[in-house]
Amino acid sequence: MASEDRYNVKETEAKWQTAWAEGGCFTAREDRTRPKYYVLEMFPYPSGRIHMGHVRNYTLGDVVARFKRAQGFNVLHPMGWDAFGLPAENAAIQRGVHPATWTRQNIAIMREQFKPMGLSIDWSREVSTCEPAYYRHEQKMFLDFLKAGLAYRRESWVNWDPVEHTVLANEQVIDGKGWRSGAPVERRKLSQWFLRITRYAEDLLAAIGDLDRWPDKVRLMQTNWIGRSEGARVRFGLVGRDQALEVYTTRPDTLFGASFCAISANHPLAAEIAATNPDLAAFIAECGRMGTSEVEIETAEKKGFDTGLKVRHPFDPAWELPVYVANFVLMEYGTGAIFGCPAHDQRDMDFARKYGLPVRAVVAPAGVDAEAFAKDLEASDTAFSEDGVAIASGFLDGLPVSEAKARAIAHIAELGAGEGVVQFRLRDWGVSRQRYWGCPIPIIHCDDCGPVPVPEDQLPVLLPEDVTFDKPGNPLDHHPTWKHVACPQCGKPARRETDTFDTFFESSWYFARFCAPHDTDRAFEREAVDYWLPVDQYVGGVEHAVLHLLYSRFFTRALRDCGYLGVSEPFTGLFTQGMICHETYRDTDGAWLSPDQIDKAADGTATLLSDGSPVSVGRSEKMSKSKMNTVDPTAILESYGADAARLFMLSDSPPDRDMDWTDSGIEGAWRYIGRLWRMALQPQIDPGAVGAPLPADLGPGAAALVRHVHKAVAGVTDDLEKFRFNAAVARLRELTNAIAALDGKEAGAGAVYRFALETAARLAAPMIPHIAEEMWSHLGRDGLLAETPWPTWDPLMLIDDQVTIAVQVNGKMRGTVDLPKDAKREDAEAAALALPTVLAQLAGAAPRKVIVVPNRIINVVV
């Protein structure tokens, strides 16, 4: 407990956490008489240890939850575990422990690490995605998606992670490498299950404009990822063949500048030619070893292979263009074929120069000498890709680019050589993963019937527990019995689908499961989801902008259309927090060192604790195990307590920016907690003023403090509403400074001191709840502060009755005086003439005159 001379952090925080739990303060129930507020942080993967990023993320969400609860909202603030995934399989291989055992042990450990943070979480709603009670509903959703045409199977080129032996979605390939393993990704062709996210591309894009409580950067990232473009599908007839090469282009206005066509290494035409051309087959194999990211493809050297085929230009059948297989053409975008216009696309220019292809200028800036411009451009290695007017383009000449595009598309359609189309960069979501520790896909493969859905009365399809990890790849593939079943349609021997779902499948709907997590018959209790959804405030990392966040938006629409939900968007508000950073340290051999291995001096230099050898201090970077610049949250909570950790996370910098972890910062937060407690022990607190109105007769300092309290309440309220948590902490510190400065001998000081401290505790409660509860209790207030309404303020108290007036001598600034608003002229003169700087200018003489501009300026003329 807190004593009269020392604040016992451990005992006090444990006491209030027990009180909150026993009082059921954070247990949420539907109550249609109250406005709801659903706060959710992106749920964690159970790695076995929380990190400082968790501390920041959950502190931010908890401040919102506590604040909204105090404002009278019915708050839902749940917790769960994103529990499937490859790390558990890796642990099984490395440690010889079953993934289920490893995962459940980690959940138990992390739950006990989270609880000392004092989070206002409704733990009764806890879910884990690896439990059959959760994923059985996911399997049912998939079958419903299958019926609705939202799920399908096809053979496709996939991103294969050779280390994790699984397929990655495009979004999971970062700079050509697997997002988890970091291994260079390979291209393979496999039969995969897909979700038809492209059906919602237009809607997903259009609705981004309505997400006005999302960060602009996330909305822009999703806009670019969906990638809507308007262009044309153009058919170039193949010379000597009764077929055409179909090309998608966003620049049909540049068709007169075409000098070649290029197809993807994965294009069917490339495969056909490669079957009899070993050199092309070798080139295609080389392309398959390239990185898969667009950035990597764009920056790589442009290479091509001349197939020997020619195509006819749609505007002139006599005009023939060569067809190349090129390493920069993506099969996944458009039609997997392009026409090259080197003069107006830098990639095409690089390719043309490499292979000696012609460069024809067909767009020039308005108002220039078109012939001279074209001559210079055609001799240059730099493409002109800006807007202008069409030149050397027949019927398009003189038209601005926008008009030339429309006219070109119309002409293509008239010729029967193509049509205008809208294209999206977004591709359907491949959800098949070749691993054990995931949700089984509820499909049975029959040689006669093909893929057959598992009957709903046989759900869930459970993962077998008797698996081994002594062979590469998916243990389900070589399980002796699990995959062998009878076909549900014909009864003949068949095989289970051994792929499991991408773990983003689970995280795309978990937020809705929290609304009624114990319903065994349905994924969602409709009354509950209709009440709680959408999530009002979601908190998490920006790295999920085009992964989890986009998939969740798609899933919500798909579930709506399948009758599960009544909303279209999952998250009304989104906040993306910054990262936690720390200095990095290396020894003389360049090996990374952890902060607890070094001794850092006041001048910023550091030495190794073990032998005193010099340590190189590097820049502050994101905390990571690889660079050993992490700080253990459990050690911080043990040493300083939850409130100090929370306060430092909130006060150091704006929550959307990266913050640097420093020992001095956490120590400063800890000292402030102690200061608050000592203020609550002050003898000037009026013991008889509990709940009583303030006395009418107050001294000037006490009256000023009352006004300061009202301003603090208004300011902190606004700061918390707008996620300016660091500003809210600063206002709280200013208020405590003002309280400490109150003269206890003034009239009404004891009552005002109590009023101000009680209000400070109420303002602090969302941020540092334990010390706030202890102060509230010590000050004699009944009930839990966690259940106490948010303080209000008097708008009249926000109007300043004091003004700061500039004082000049002969027009030059010499100081300021603080006076009551609309002070009498003689009072203003007297205050100005009493300033030491003015007295020095007067040098004992009387002023010639004093000019007073009320509430603004006093000018002393000497």
UniProtKB/Swiss-Prot annotation:
GO molecular function, one term: leucine-tRNA ligase activity
Positions contributing to ATP binding: 625
SUPFAM superfamilies for the chain: Anticodon-binding domain of a subclass of class I aminoacyl-tRNA synthetases (SSF47323), Nucleotidylyl transferase (SSF52374), ValRS/IleRS/LeuRS editing domain (SSF50677)
Subcellular location: Cytoplasm
Motif ('KMSKS' region): 622-626
Segments carrying motif 'HIGH' region: 44-54
Class of enzymatic activity (EC top level): ligase
Gene Ontology terms: cellular component: cytosol
Keywords: Aminoacyl-tRNA synthetase, ATP-binding, Cytoplasm, Ligase, Nucleotide-binding, Protein biosynthesis
GO BP annotations, alphabetical order: leucyl-tRNA aminoacylation
First-listed, main subcellular location of the protein, grouped into a coarse class: cytoplasm
Its EC number(s): 6.1.1.4
Catalytic activity: tRNA(Leu) + L-leucine + ATP = L-leucyl-tRNA(Leu) + AMP + diphosphate
Any single Pfam family the record assigns to this protein: tRNA-synt_1g
Family, similarity comment: Belongs to the class-I aminoacyl-tRNA synthetase family.
Protein name stated in the entry: Leucine--tRNA ligase
